[in-house]
C-alpha cells in the first residue's frame, strides 16, 4: 500500500508539473508581439526597421495603439529612385522620414476586410491614402501583398511600394 501511495503521489506531482509547464507555454504563446517587435522579427522588413529607428518611431509603434501599419517590404524600398533611401536615412532628414513613415500608419485596427470597404482613410501623418479594391487590394499605387498580421497593438499589411505623401 505504501508503494502504491508513493507511486500515486509521484505521478500526481509529475502530472501537475507538466500541466503547469504546458499552461505557461500556452500563455506565453498567446501573447502577441507589438507592431515594432513583429516588424523586427520579419526578415522581409529589415529596411523598414532601419527607417523606423532612424526616424525614432520605435516607441510609437510599441505604444498602446491600436494602429494599422501598411509596411513596405525590403523590395519596396529598392523601388525608390536611386539615392532616395540614403537621403531619407540621413539624420538631417529625420522629420521628412517620420512624415513618410507615419503616412503608412492609420489609427485603429483595420483588418483587410474593413479596409477594402473604404475609398480612402486618414493616416497618422494627416493626409488620406486612397484605397482601391477593384483589382486586388491597393493603397495609393502600392499593392497589398500580405494582410492581417496580428499584433498586440494592431495589425500589419505588407505592401510592395513605399507610398509618399505630398510634403
Predicted regions and their residues:
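Bacterial N-terminal signal peptides
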Residues: 10-20
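Mature, structured domains of secreted/extracytosolic soluble proteins
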Residues: 3-6, 21-167
Amino acid at each position: 500500500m505504501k508503494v502504491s501511495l508513493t507511486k500515486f503521489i509521484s505521478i500526481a506531482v509529475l502530472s501537475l508539473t507538466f500541466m503547469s509547464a504546458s499552461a505557461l507555454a500556452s500563455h506565453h504563446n498567446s501573447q502577441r508581439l507589438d507592431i515594432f517587435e513583429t516588424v523586427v522579427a520579419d526578415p522581409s522588413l529589415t529596411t523598414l526597421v532601419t527607417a523606423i529607428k532612424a526616424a525614432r518611431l520605435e516607441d510609437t509603434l510599441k505604444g498602446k495603439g491600436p494602429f494599422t501599419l501598411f509596411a513596405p517590404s525590403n523590395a519596396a524600398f529598392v523601388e525608390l529612385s536611386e539615392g532616395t533611401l540614403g537621403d531619407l536615412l540621413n539624420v538631417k532628414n529625420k522629420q521628412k522620414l517620420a512624415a513618410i513613415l507615419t503616412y503608412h500608419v492609420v489609427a485603429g485596427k483595420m483588418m483587410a476586410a474593413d479596409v477594402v470597404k473604404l475609398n480612402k482613410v486618414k493616416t497618422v501623418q494627416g493626409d488620406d491614402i486612397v484605397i482601391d479594391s477593384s483589382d486586388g487590394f491597393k493603397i495609393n499605387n502600392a499593392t497589398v501583398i500580405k494582410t492581417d498580421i496580428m499584433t498586440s497593438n494592431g495589425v500589419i499589411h505588407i505592401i510592395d511600394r513605399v507610398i509618399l505623401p505630398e510634403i
